[in-house]
Amino acid sequence: MSPTVSAVPDEFLDDSAERPQIRGPRRRTVSEGPAAGHEVLSNPTSARISRVAGLSRRNARAKHRRFLVEGPQGVREAVRHAPGRVLDVYLTEAALERHSEIWDEAVAAGLYVHVTTQQVMDAMSPDAQGLLAVVATEEATGSEAVAAALEGARLVAVLTQAQDPGNAGSIIRAADAAGADAVVLVRGSVDPTAPKVVRSTAGSLFHLPVVTGVALDDAVTALHNAGLTVLAADGRGDFDLFEAESLLEAHCAWLLGNEAHGLPSEALSRADAVVSIPIYGKAESLNVAAAAAVCLYASARAQAQHSGRS
């Protein structure tokens, strides 16, 4: 079967004449090497490659409503858990050989897959490790999106004005690992589709709802309306995390502060309880990503034990 070309126009990718595309389901046949028989994208200065590379900028992501997923782990999770949002997958010949299962899953899902030279891959993203996907941005902003994400929730992480993309991505990953039902980024926080955030989630961005663009007051109101106890993580807390079993057993949301300034006073005043993590060594504090992981896992453990006793 020869590669097929989409008949659907896309003004983001309007140079379709240079788009060698393989769309599944199909069998990959290889004679000498994993990309044999398939044309390779080799022009790093083409308009298409430039537009994909441009998605590293926030204004381009907002305009085109799509973002980059870089690296094998992120691309694999996008293909497995959000194939309907994956618009294109790009991989080098070396990456195709190392990660043939991603090729197979993408083709089986009917996705467009493109083999590129390393030079083209580097032009699109120097951090892609040979694998890159362009993914449609999910519309999950504002109060209605928060209410929908919180329906039936037991554990939620809320980031208030988080600015560090690595920390934001790590918190999304920790929330996913702890079994949280959603992550809310209060208005003024970093864009969760920024490349470093996406990389730091290691694919968790596609495992649970991530809601943005909601004011802090509206977020707390939605949390209370969903029946969640709102806990603020702060070093000046009235409760020690490891002595607050009754708080942790409840369905709850953790408010997590800005890396430099912690939680704002309005967040502390709206919380049902302010909880601190004890420091046993000489460190002044934990960074927000580490603190989030500790708090979320403490709640997950307490909820599981309480459920087992019920």
Residue spans of the language-model regions?
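Arg/Lys-rich RNA-binding interfaces used to dock onto structured RNA substrates
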Residues: 1-165, 188, 309-310
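RNA substrate-binding interface of SAM-dependent RNA methyltransferases
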Residues: 3, 114, 140-237
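Glycine- and other small-residue-rich loops at beta-strand/loop junctions that grip anionic moieties
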Residues: 41, 67, 160-161, 184-187, ...
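Short beta->alpha linker loops
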Residues: 70-73, 119, 163, 193, ...
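Short, hinge-like loop/turn segments at secondary-structure boundaries
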Residues: 107, 131, 200-204, 248-251
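Structured adenosyl-cofactor binding patch, chiefly the S-adenosyl-L-methionine
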Residues: 133, 174-178, 189-205, 265, ...
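Active-site/ligand-binding-proximal alpha/beta "capping" segment
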Residues: 231-283
